[in-house]
Amino acid sequence: MNVTSKPGELVPESDVAAIMRGTHGDPFRVLGMHGGGGAPLSVRVFAPQAAEVAVLGQGGEVLAPLERIGAEGFFAGTVPGEEKFPYRLRFVSGPHEWEADDPYRFPEVLGELDEYLLGEGRHYQLYTRLGAHPAEIEGVQGVSFAVWAPNARRVSVVGAFNAWDGRRHPMRKRIGVGVWELFVPGLHTGDLYKYELLGPSGERLPLKSDPLSFAQEAPPATASVVHGLPEAEWHDAGWMQERESRQRRDAPISIYEVHAGSWRQGLDYDALAEELSAYVREMGFTHVEFLPISEHPFTGSWGYQPIGLFAPTARFGPPEGFARLVDRLHRDGIGVILDWVPAHFPSDAHGLANFDGTHLYDHADPRQGFHRDWNTQIYNFGRQEVANFLQASALFWLDRYHVDALRVDAVASMLYLDYSRNAGEWVPNRHGGRENLEAIDFLRGVNERVRLDHPGCITIAEESTAFPQVSRPVEDGGLGFGFKWNMGWMHDTLGYFRRDPIHRKHHQNDLTFGMVYAYSEDFVLPLSHDEVVHGKGSLIGQMAGDRWQKFANLRAYFGFMWAHPGKKLLFMGGEFAQEREWNHDASLDWHLLDDPSHAGMKRLVADLNREYRKRPALHRMDCDPEGFEWIDAGDSENSVLSFLRKAPGEKPVLAVCNLTPVVRSDYRIGVPEGGEWREILNSDAAIYGGSDVGNPGGLQAEEFSWHGRPASLRLTLPPLATIFVTPA
């Protein structure tokens, strides 16, 4: 049966019914202007909010009223003319009258190249096409929407502009790539929206946020916000030119890890730009690493269960605010590292889980697709569209926000199919092994794209296993990361400093074993947020001994860490010996700096950063075995160890650690050259809160062979302390 609204105008009743029910999968076949080329022109509109609809010409004149068909607001009618033309619509509802452009008169949003790249899984700037983009099409301002949902029966964009009615703005499906698109005239930056989808069986799914939204409502609200691609006003050209040299293996890299919400509570991005940047400059760190900034619904996840992989969290202001934060850090000579989470995603109803009514982003088999430790879904890295989505997210932060590095979270969980699973709870790879071959290929692909598209940017792996060549080039069989966190070093050394000094002589290996594998990867030494949560206590709280010994131990530990090969990372609060375990709902205890012991710790960390940056011997050969030499690793009876840090053509630095609360006088240590030496740093100095035992003034190396070296120094070793000594 056909419904006739005007002579020559036929609208299949089934199409009218499907549009009014909101189940039609091809709205452009029904709505908009049809005919031309000899056939009568007709216009069909679904407007349940209107009592009358008329078609207007380009000059605003009424060309034809449309006839209402049925009670649900479907209008149709013929209009004069032989070929299709731009038109507008006038709506009347009671005393209200308004005009608007018809979304269904506009052409396709995606081009042929977009379709090709999407089909290939190589649209690395996916964010320039999918998502919500303010645009002008045929002289009309509006917003272009596009979302991947290949298994959905119908997708609509909804918001206050259509009373969240999914029947009113159904989208066009690009069959070949499974992307739904629609240009909606009259929408603006700041408008809220979501997608309403019908699943494969026609079931209405929970409203979904846009996977490629550039802004989200502040949680607990969950709508996406229309926002164009970030277009910040950048002033960081100097940093960008120098960035590559500041992030090489031979550069000093000292990272301050920050949770933006609890460093100092109540700060937005702009306040952080002022206060955090000034503080990091004062402390001498080279980089700030932010716990995940991408939008996440649950604050207690610290950002590690993100949903908005292209949206800075709205908790601290708009996206432009985050750009200004990065810009300010760069202008102050500080690099920016973001924690990035491609391993898994939360199952919140408005997110990626069951996005189009299927396991679109994850695996249907829970042995592959569900992470029991975190109650999250695991991405299907073998699906090229999913890999492309994640790759585009990584590149987005580097491209649009000038981020310098990505610290990739939970890499170990990606690399192994049996990660945290018992026998029978995982599916072997095609060779029968436990390695996740698709994830390995994905990580290599991301790292290669970063290297090719953003030279000078780096990636850093949080990887806790012995998986080989994590930080080696892809062409050499590696994963292609720039650096890897040295979790083994952290575990061993932190365990050592938890021990009572009386027992340490039996555990010297905890401090020395790290050098056995120190150059198997390019390492970062991490004292991260993970070490000060879940009942572990603060760093200072984990140190052995009474209050004085705890502070002395932590100062000695920091001295050992800054002297040890590897880049440095310290979580906020550790630098001044925060005493409470970290709480994401509270600020750091800045009032502790009124206590000389805490203020002294802060000064020590600043001085360690200064020495580390100033002295090539301490950083240039961090990743080269030629930059390290044991003097004596074997004096376990006294819990003393000594080693040299070196760089070609530079003065060496001798580090000596005395890790019992006993002063050791006239302690002889072999050195590579005679002449005058001097103590340049002493963690026991009074300015750091120590007992001020040490080696003031100059030190004369004696021509007395010791430890296999031609000369030696007689030192006073302060209790529970690390000292640095160098030729004068």
UniProtKB/Swiss-Prot annotation:
It comes from Cereibacter sphaeroides (strain ATCC 17023 / DSM 158 / JCM 6121 / CCUG 31486 / LMG 2827 / NBRC 12203 / NCIMB 8253 / ATH 2.4.1.) (Rhodobacter sphaeroides). Belongs to the glycosyl hydrolase 13 family. GlgB subfamily. The lineage of its organism: Bacteria, Pseudomonadati, Pseudomonadota, Alphaproteobacteria, Rhodobacterales. GO terms for cellular component: cytosol. Disulfide bonds: none annotated. Catalyzes the formation of the alpha-1,6-glucosidic linkages in glycogen by scission of a 1,4-alpha-linked oligosaccharide from growing alpha-1,4-glucan chains and the subsequent attachment of the oligosaccharide to the alpha-1,6 position. It comes from the Bacteria. This is 1,4-alpha-glucan branching enzyme GlgB. Its EC number is 2.4.1.18. Pathway: Glycan biosynthesis; glycogen biosynthesis. The active site is at D409, E462. It is an enzyme of class 2 (transferase). Monomer. One of its GO terms (molecular function) is 1,4-alpha-glucan branching enzyme activity.
